Amino acid sequence: MITISDAAQAHFVKLLADQPEGTHIRVFVISPGTAQAECGVSYCPPDAVESDDIELEFNGFSAMVDEKSAPFLEEASIDFVTDQLGSQLTLKAPNAKMRKVASDAPLAERVEYVIQSEINPQLASHGGNIMLVEITQEGVAVLQFGGGCNGCSQVDITLKDGIEKQLLDMFPGELSGVSDVTDHQHGAHSYA
């Protein structure tokens, strides 16, 4: 369900050493399955463990997950990264905003899942997003840009070198390309 890197496990063990005995961590999703979903990690003292919690055992501690959050934490990963700027705990949960769709689901559902779980989080750093309008009979994913991507001078590069390449790699033989139907209006909202 959740992968915790060795570095993150060591970090949690160090943090938990300063907590009362029996304290573990809790991994959770607030508003799971919605665009507002947010993931978090907190301390979980023994008296906060619920009877329906799922206990994931790691080296020196356990991660508690509430039953409601569990399906949205499938394929989640926690890492502790150190670089020149310092250290950072990262939690990636690709299914937090929407559940992963089955591999035999209709193409539009699978493409929408990739857009919401992988592409839009990347575009969000620029205040942008895309929406799947349709998939044509020819296999072209028709997209509409929003937010900071609308009117951005880099939208063609983002579309062809980023989004199209990623979608064609993920859906070979099913998608033949992407097209943009956005009426781009450059303004203060545009990223560049």
Curated annotation (Swiss-Prot):
Binding residue positions for [4Fe-4S] cluster: C149, C152
Listed InterPro entries: Fe/S_biogenesis_protein_NfuA, FeS_biogenesis, FSCA_dom_sf, HesB-like_dom_sf, NIF_FeS_clus_asmbl_NifU_C
Pfam families: Fe-S_biosyn, NifU
MF terms (GO), sorted A to Z: 4 iron, 4 sulfur cluster binding; iron ion binding
PANTHER family the UniProt entry points to: FE_S BIOGENESIS PROTEIN NFUA, IRON-SULFUR CLUSTER SCAFFOLD PROTEIN NFU-RELATED
Primary role: Involved in iron-sulfur cluster biogenesis. Binds a 4Fe-4S cluster, can transfer this cluster to apoproteins, and thereby intervenes in the maturation of Fe/S proteins. Could also act as a scaffold/chaperone for damaged Fe/S proteins.
Subunit structure: Homodimer.
Annotated protein name in UniProt: Fe/S biogenesis protein NfuA
Native source species: Shewanella sp. (strain ANA-3)
